[in-house]
């Protein structure tokens, strides 16, 4: 279960001071996780039909409701998606449902969402996450072979695939955190651009039960990053990672009007 919001702030403050930006704030409940061993990354037959109806009648309507009525998401920069059929998409991880913020911002494009394997969970929420396009990583080699095949399959068929390069979710944390290289490895491996996104917050004027002000969202879609022909694979991974992170740092400073301090 999520920790109380004030407790979350204290944990974030502590981890920030220690420079441990990829640590999880909420405890991970492995008891509700389902093994990825039998996860179908590419849905077929009756499962594909089931997922279609779940996505059409539950996931999509809730995505619209959440973004229009609850967090009142504004999307900036959708013109950068023009002409980009397949891509790796990155975003800061700041909200339990920020994958739905990404879905809303990227509407009109098919989106798959990478996730830690413990997110493949039991119950209704797990069902909806799978219907919404979740692709869990795995600690097992054989499962990652299937994951990698699915990556290739979807990118060849005009899909976007979302990565959270910060790894852990920090609730309503406004600063960009250091990026891992996984997303950029796949962009270089499959020859697709990276579309950087960054979520910022605006005040709602509403106070929640913890005495904290609720936030409204702005999703910034930024200019795609392409690999450079003159660089080898390793160099391009690092170039794209650094470029993406710097773009998010610049967006933070532009939006909030203050220098980034970590």
Question: Which sequence ranges carry the predicted segments?
Answer:
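Short, charge-rich binding segments
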Residues: 80-83, 104-105, 152-156
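A conditional alpha-helix N-cap/helix-loop micro-motif detector
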Residues: 71, 140-144, 176-177
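A generic secondary-structure micro-motif detector
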Residues: 52, 114-115, 140, 172-174
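Catalytic core of membrane glycerolipid acyltransferases/transacylases, capturing the structured
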Residues: 83-141
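Non-catalytic C-terminal accessory region of glycerolipid acyltransferases
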Residues: 1-25, 148-262
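Membrane-anchoring hydrophobic helices of lipid-metabolizing enzymes
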Residues: 1-88, 97-101
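Short amphipathic alpha-helical segments and helix-helix/interface helices
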Residues: 63, 102-103, 126, 151, ...
């Amino acid at each position: 279960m999520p920790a109380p919001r004030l407790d979350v702030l204290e944990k974030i403050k502590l981890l920030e001071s220690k420079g441990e930006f990829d640590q999880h704030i909420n405890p991970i409940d492995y008891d509700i996780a389902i093994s990825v061993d039998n996860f179908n990354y590419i849905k077929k037959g009756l499962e594909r039909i089931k997922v279609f109806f779940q996505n059409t009648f539950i996931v999509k309507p809730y995505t619209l409701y959440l973004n229009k009525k609850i967090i009142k998401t504004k999307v900036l920069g959708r013109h950068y998606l023009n002409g980009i059929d397949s891509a790796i998409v990155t975003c800061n991880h700041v909200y339990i449902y920020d994958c739905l913020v990404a879905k809303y911002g990227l509407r009109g494009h098919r989106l798959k969402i990478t996730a830690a394997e413990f997110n493949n969970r039991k119950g209704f929420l797990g069902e909806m996450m799978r219907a919404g396009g979740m692709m869990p990583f795995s600690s097992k080699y054989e499962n990652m072979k299937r994951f990698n095949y699915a990556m290739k399959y979807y990118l060849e068929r005009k899909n976007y695939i979302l990565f959270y390069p910060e790894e852990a979710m920090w609730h309503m944390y406004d600063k960009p955190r250091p990026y891992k290289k996984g997303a950029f490895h796949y962009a270089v491996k499959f020859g697709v651009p990276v579309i950087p996104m960054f979520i910022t917050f605006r005040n709602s004027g509403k106070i929640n039960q913890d005495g904290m002000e609720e936030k409204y969202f702005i999703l910034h879609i930024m200019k795609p990053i392409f690999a450079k022909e003159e660089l080898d694979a390793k160099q391009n991974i690092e170039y794209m990672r650094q470029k993406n992170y710097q773009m998010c740092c610049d967006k933070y400073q532009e939006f909030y009007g203050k220098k980034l301090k970590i």
